[in-house]
Amino acid sequence: MSRIGKKPVPIPQNVQVEIKDGNCVLVKGPLGQLEKTFSPLLTIKKVDNQIVVERPNDEKFVKALHGLTRALINNMVLGVTQGFEKRLELQGTGYRARVQGNKLILEVGFSHPVELEIPTGLTVTVQDNTKISVKGIDKELVGQFAAIVRSVRPAEPYKGKGIRYEGEKIRQKAGKAGKK
């Protein structure tokens, strides 16, 4: 069995889980609700206070789906109880960010500010004009939006200017040696 897939997903007290049509899972918790449809190759059951994912055979593809499905369900349960957060930093002279309505506006050295639409279900806050925090209950959506923000101006390896995740290390390169 898949090492991750064979572990049952525990359901906390304040979370309700519904399994519809055998492969559609609805998770409701204090922070909101998430619904996701999974592959019909797998069987998803609610046993006691746990969700168990079972697979019909040991084909490589099905084994991979087994672990993936269990991890996604676990992330749904964690999302509706704790939520997820990604933090980004802007580094560079004059680099600023601000939230205006449902848009994140980035001024990162281009001739114009870059406006990004904040997806529904996410909360974006900016501290000190240089620290961006993306919060939400859907791990995939939080990570995807944070990656989109970072891709506007990824940190460059010479001076380290750009947008990076908090705590991300950028490998510095030596500049060219110049004439002597």
From Swiss-Prot:
Domain of life the protein comes from: Bacteria
Function summary: This protein binds to the 23S rRNA, and is important in its secondary structure. It is located near the subunit interface in the base of the L7/L12 stalk, and near the tRNA binding site of the peptidyltransferase center.
Transmembrane parts of this sequence: none
One term under GO cellular component: cytosolic large ribosomal subunit
Family statement drawn from the similarity comment of this UniProt entry: Belongs to the universal ribosomal protein uL6 family.
Alphabetized Pfam families for the sequence: Ribosomal_L6
Matching InterPro entries: Ribosomal_uL6-like, Ribosomal_uL6-like_a/b-dom_sf, Ribosomal_uL6_a/b-dom, Ribosomal_uL6_bac-type
Protein name: Large ribosomal subunit protein uL6
Gene Ontology MF term list: rRNA binding; structural constituent of ribosome
Subunit architecture: Part of the 50S ribosomal subunit.
GO biological process, any: cytoplasmic translation
Keywords for the protein's UniProt record, in alphabetical order: Ribonucleoprotein, Ribosomal protein, RNA-binding, rRNA-binding
Gene for this chain: rplF
Organism: Dictyoglomus thermophilum (strain ATCC 35947 / DSM 3960 / H-6-12)
